[in-house]
UniProtKB/Swiss-Prot annotation:
SUPFAM superfamilies: Multidrug resistance efflux transporter EmrE. It holds the Pfam family UPF0060. The chain crosses the membrane at residues 6-26, 32-52, 61-81, 87-107. This is UPF0060 membrane protein CMS0846. It is a multi-pass membrane protein. Its main location: membrane. The lineage of its organism: Bacteria, Bacillati, Actinomycetota, Actinomycetes, Micrococcales. GO terms for cellular component: plasma membrane. It comes from Clavibacter sepedonicus.
Amino acid sequence: MLLRTVILFALAAVAEIGGAWLIWQAVREGRPFWWAGLGVMALGAYGFIATLQADASFGRILAAYGGVFVAGSLLWGTVVDGYRPDRWDVIGAVVCLVGVAVIMAAPRGQGA
């Protein structure tokens, strides 16, 4: 189940961050406007991917995904745009990922 969660979060990040990046490229960087259309489709795919998580709590999934989004955005910027995160970016991303682990892996049940 953990592997499935990680894979779905990674796919969601690629769809959301990639979609937003495509729109950014069309609007801010002068790429063809059809890039924005592809971005909108990728953002729509992100919405569907989130529903595939095993946990039924929308709030929990989206809150945990937020941490993945933070780290994934920095990674995307580094790989795709040549952005160089500083130590505070990295520390912030690690804090977010620790939060993701707490939210998703905490033992839950009666009295939790």
